Regions:
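C-terminal and inter-domain tail/linker signature
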Residues: 1-136
Length: 136
């Protein structure tokens, strides 16, 4: 099956999700972040408490050094998929695949797959999991 070009709405959804993640995880601007997440936000992650309040509450207790970096963002219809890296919260960063369902221009539902970032010694492929360098 040939790849289909993304629609303008898909590009817009990607930009909304990227702005939302930066606003919440990097800038810690909770008031601004509220406009990106639905009040009826559904959370499927095993690591995050339910709802928008659960997510925001978890981030509030994380260290100020928490950072999110994006490597890949793609969209299909109302779904946005990200491959990113969370660091600054402990000794090992997480490499995460996030799937977000958009509804009426806001993040409505979320799933994720999380792995500890492998060091060079741990990588059987010999390649980094995120970017072009292994963690220091």
């Amino acid at each position: 099956m040939a790849a289909q070009p993304r629609s303008g709405n898909e590009d817009h959804n990607v930009q909304i999700v990227l702005n939302a993640f930066d606003t919440l995880f990097n800038k810690r601007d909770y008031a601004a972040a509220e406009r990106y997440w639905s009040p009826r936000y559904i959370q499927h992650s095993a690591h995050i408490p339910p709802g928008r309040e659960g997510l925001f509450g978890m981030i509030k207790i994380m260290p100020e050094t928490l950072r999110y970096q994006i490597q890949v963002a793609a969209a299909a219809g109302d779904f946005v998929i990200l491959h990113g890296r969370f660091s600054g919260f402990g000794p090992t960063a997480w490499v995460v695949a996030d799937i977000v369902r958009m509804e009426d221009g806001v993040l409505a539902e979320h799933w994720d797959v999380i792995q500890d970032e492998a060091t060079r010694e741990q990588s059987r492929s010999g390649l980094p999991m995120f970017g072009d360098k292994f963690p220091a």
